Amino acid sequence: MEVERLKTKDIDSYRNFIKDVFGYDVSKKNVSDAMKNSIILALKLDNKVIASITLEESKEYIKGKKYYYASYFGVLNDYRRMGFATKIFDKVEELVEKNKIDYIELTSGNQRKEAHSFYSKHNFRIKDTTVFIKFYE
């Protein structure tokens, strides 16, 4: 099982993955657009996406630091605690080195304690900040 970029043929499986792990219905168009503008890594078993992460590359214009913003990092419930998140993250680390990325940033809900434990084990630190959001209809 190899971690690789999501392919067009895997969009439906990925949509099911997002629904199962995060509870969101995502359209084929939105996934297709994300595939053009982001790196979506997936781990599949029998053509089913069981783990994934999305990386968006950006650059701090003041400090000149390149970074990945990571989102939708998860593993299907039946496949947790089997090393698949680590396998995905190992691939991310390869890309960090290859693309000379300075750091990875992610946001995680307060209730995701198991994920927070994983991040800590992989040397992420909590950034002392508060996130504000304003929605427009």
Label every model-predicted segment.
Residues 5-65, 71:
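Acetyl-CoA-dependent GNAT
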Residues 1-2:
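Extreme N-terminal starter segment of soluble prokaryotic enzymes
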Residues 89, 96-108:
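Conserved GNAT acetyl-CoA-binding A-motif
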Residues 72-75, 81-94, 117, 121:
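Conserved acetyl-CoA-binding loop-helix of GNAT-fold acetyltransferases
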Residues 13-17, 87, 91, 131:
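Alpha-helical elements of Rossmann-like donor-binding domains used by nucleotide-donor carbohydrate transfer enzymes
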